[in-house]
Amino acid sequence: MMSRLHSAARWLQGVSNRRRAIVLLLFIGWAAVHATDGRAQRPTFREEWAAGVTGGINYSTVFFAPKVHQSPMQGFNGGVALRWITERNLGLQLEAGFRQLGWRERFDEQPQYRYIRRMNYVELPFLTHIYFGSDRVRFFFNLGPQIGFLTGESTDENLNGATPNKTNDQHTMAIERRFAWGLCGGPGVELRTSVGYFQLEGRYYYSLGDFYSTRHGDAFSKASPQVFTMRLAYFMPFTLRH
C-alpha cells in the first residue's frame, strides 16, 4: 500500500497544475463515496427532490502566461438549484446562476495605479452530490463539470495609457472567447429543519479553457481563471406525483 502511495506521489509531481487539479477533485469525490460503504444499513431509502436558491461571494484570479501580478478580486454570485437524491449518500444537482469574476492587478512599485477587470458569466454546473451524516445535519461534497457564457465585462482603472507592469497587453484586450468550461467542487454542511434545508458551502472552480486566443504568436499562451466561492443556500423539499 505504501509503495503505491509513493508511486502516486511521484506521478503527481510530474503532471501539470491543470491535470493535478483534475486528479485531486476526482480523488476527493472517489474517497467520499467509498467512505460511506462501511456504514451500517438504515431503513428503506426514499428518493428526495429539493429546489433552492443560492448566493455568496467569490475571490478570483487569472492564470496568465506571461505572468500578470495580481491580488484576488472580490465578486458575487447567485442562482437557483435543483437536487435529486437518487440513492443513499449520492445524488445529482443541477444549477443555473450568475457569477462575477476577473482580476485585480498589483502595482507594487507604483501603487498609485489601479486596474480591475470584471467579467459577468451565466453558468451551469452539473454536479454529483455526495453526502453523509444524520437526519438533522449532513456533510456533503459537490463535484462536476461547469459551463458558462460571458454576458458582459467592465474595467475600473486609472492608467491613462501608462504601462506600469511587465505585462500590459491585457489592458487593451477585450475578452475573445465568451464560452467557458471547467471543473468545480467543494465541501459543505447542511442543516435540515422542518422549514427547509440551510447550507454553507465552499467551492473551487478551475477553468479548462482560456478567454483570450492562445495560439502561437498571440500575446498570451494562457489566460484561464480560478475562483474560490463561499455561499449560502436554502433548499425546500418537494414530492413528485406519479
Which residue ranges define each predicted feature?
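Residues that define the transmembrane beta-barrel architecture of outer-membrane proteins
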Residues: 47-49, 72-76, 118-124, 137, ...
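Extracellular loop and loop/strand-boundary signature of outer-membrane beta-barrel proteins
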Residues: 63-68, 110-115, 169-175, 215-220
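Flexible, solvent-exposed coil segments and beta strand-coil junctions
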Residues: 56-62, 102-110, 160-170, 209-214
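Predominantly the C-terminal beta-signal and adjacent terminal strand-loop region
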Residues: 95, 180, 185, 192-242
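Short glycine/proline- and aromatic-enriched beta-strand/turn motifs that initiate or cap beta-hairpins
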Residues: 36-81, 237, 242
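Cleavable N-terminal export/targeting peptides
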Residues: 1-46, 238-242
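Gram-negative (and chloroplast) outer-membrane scaffold detector with strong preference
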Residues: 41, 45, 49, 83-159, ...
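Outer-membrane beta-barrel pore domains and translocons
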Residues: 56-60, 97-99, 144-148, 203-207, ...
